[in-house]
Amino acid sequence: MHTMWKGTISFGLVNIPVKMHAATENKDVKLRQLHKECKTPIKYEKVCPVCDRKVEEDEIVRAYEYTKNKFVVVEDDDLKEIQKEQGDKAVEIIDFVKLEEIDPIYFDKSYYLSPNEGGLKAYSLLRTALEETGKIGVAKMMIRSKERLAVIRFYENTLVVETIHYPDEVRAVQDVPNVPEKGEVVKKELD
């Protein structure tokens, strides 16, 4: 299994070296677009709509759109500094809670964690503690320059880290259209 990230699980004075592996894989069939005549894959070019010309990689910068069509450019050095400040290779456990305390709507992606060199004993201790207490670790971690919330839990003899959404990323259920009121079901229809 391919290692996609190496770092540490940390809480208190404990640091456990780990490797992270994707727990799922996409099995969707991907169709390519081809030129009908010669069956060659279509190429996509990056074009500036204002200058009306193709843009090379070295001419492209990343930016945050803070309001419609208003941007602040974010340099690579800025992102590296943020990563350095926030511990880009650490999964920092900030609390331990019961799994039932986090609604499944918050869960996003799952990754397996395996012990890295020198971490076997501490990994085993954390795994056993989570299994026996039925608790999960709520953590902060950096993935691709973005701080994420996550949980670490016991799963089939291994540790799994699952990224979770921040509360403001989950849409309000009140915004779902055409949901009937709760009292619209007759009790005997349920029997």
Where are the language model's segments positioned?
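Boundary segments of small protein-protein interaction reader/adaptor domains
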Residues: 1-191
